[in-house]
Amino acid sequence: MKIICIADIHGNREAIKNVKEFAISRGIERFIILGDFPGYESFKDEGENLEEIKDVLNMLKNFKVLAIPGNCDHPRAVDVFNEFNVNLHEKIIVMDDLSLVGLGGSTPTPFGTPFEIGEEEIYNKLKKLIESVETDRFILALHNPPFNTECDATADGVHIGSISIRKIVEEFQPSLVLSSHVHESGGKTDKIGNSVIANIGPLMHNRIGILDINGDIKIELMKI
């Protein structure tokens, strides 16, 4: 089973069209969206924010989609996801012999974005979810990457990932951590123990990931 992973769309409809065409050309029917749907001009307006999310989901209506919110998405994005039957936020979805565990939002930013969560809340929510996983293997689908990896460094080399997510990864060792959020680290991977960390990168710049679940779990990051 192959799944296209995208994130940080930020209102770029042309990028959605491109990835749809790519998916069709590869015969891939599934998407995981790791948040940040709206453009930078509209994310602070609740109505515009939610409409942009609906627009993207309508554009991908012929695919099987799962989604979490990013920090630029309004908290009511979860209501939209439920309306479209795509919600992965604070959910566990079993695929074959593994579980997909989703948590959206990010740690606080300097920009006052609508979906920001404190470190303690992130840790508690993820711990509770993971302790309910019944399969031997699981994947974390997050917006925020863990702290101090190749996947969370800004252009200045400052690491801005979540300390709590790193602690969760160290404690529970998921097979794979999907993330985005830090655009400058898009397309990079790293490891924490045996866990592979991947920053999918911003779809607004045509970056995607292809998750391949076929016994082994593999992630291929690319620009289309």
Residue ranges and their predicted role:
Residues 1-10, 97-106, 139-143, 196-201, ...:
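Active-site-proximal beta-strand elements of phosphoester/diester hydrolases
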Residues 5-7, 31-36, 64-71, 87-89, ...:
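Active-site neighborhood of phospho(di)ester-bond hydrolases with catalytic His/Asp-centered motifs
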Residues 10-14, 38-41, 69-78, 108-111, ...:
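Active-site environment of divalent metal-dependent phosphoester hydrolases
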Residues 13-95:
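Core catalytic region of metal-dependent phosphoesterases/phosphodiesterases
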Residues 24, 42, 72-161, 223:
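Conserved catalytic scaffold of divalent metal-dependent phosphoesterases
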Residues 26, 57-62, 133, 169-172, ...:
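Short, conserved loop/helix-junction motifs that constitute active-site signature segments
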Residues 33, 38-56, 145-147, 151-182, ...:
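Cap/insert and terminal regions of metallo-dependent hydrolase folds
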Residues 93-97, 117-118, 166-172, 185-224:
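Binuclear metal-dependent phosphoesterase catalytic core
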